Amino acid sequence: RFPVNDSNKTSKIEPRPDSDIQFFQALLEGIASIEKEAYEKLHELGAARPVRLYTAGGGSNNPAWTAIRSQIIGTDIVQALHSEACYGSALLARSGYLAANPA
């Protein structure tokens, strides 16, 4: 439930627009807004604000989704060189391993 830990928080999908396209766009904008809140929360906790975000996975191939995220978050979003989502996880694991096991 990051960035807001509230088990009583309810969904806000009503009133639903008549247009399925408008409804879908609103859902994507809502998801991007939550992502923005997450970066803001991380900044409150001491992390630097992102200057550029790298995106991976299936959604990274959707230019409309990338544009929505970029506009709402307010930063450049570029497709990662390796677009499989697991690649980032592997890099984080490697980084953690190297930090715990210096040469």
Where are these regions (language model features)?
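Acidic, glycine/GT-rich loop-and beta-edge segments that sit at the periphery of enzyme/chaperone cores
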Residues: 96-103
